[in-house]
Amino acid sequence: KMGRVGLHTHPYILASHSYAEESSPIHRGVFVSRKILGRTLRPPKEAVSFRNADYNPNWTMRQKVTALTKPANCMSCHDLINATGFTLEGFDTTGRTRTNLGTKPLNLSTEYLDENGNQKKLDGAQGLLQEALKSTRSSKYFIEELCKHLAKHPIQSYSNLNFLELSKMLSSKKLAIKDLYLKIAMQAATDDFVFDN
């Protein structure tokens, strides 16, 4: 349940998606939903600012965020955002692990609606990682982002890279990340290059 498992638990990622004094399940949930799970979120119709002073100081961030996002027009996106963000409450604002908030134990379990509409139980950062590893959308998004990072172009720009095949190979563990990295780098460097014999 606790500990570092995957990119989403790196202290830099966690700290950069926190408030100065508190963790932020909303910012962390948006990051994980978009960048780890590859899910699409639309911008909110009405942006509501979080102000810690508006809530009981004895409440956990989970209680505060649940109260803030309770309206139906918020929950259309916050079902996903909150479910993924609450799994990372085992990390404080700087990314250190924690099991309690003061004297209260943290609840890291959530109900998550996956990309196919199936209800899943996520149990902390490990549960989130397991869901990401099972998701074909996650592997596709990872490959797209890696290609943009390495080649500075979308993967569709390279005719010899079969995006779906790479995604299936990555998901089924037939392709290691380092080999994917090399494949993309080589393709980007040699695309449309004619070798003389």
Which residue ranges define each predicted feature?
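Active-site substrate-binding loop specific to GH73 endo-beta-N-acetylglucosaminidase modules
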Residues: 1-150, 156-197
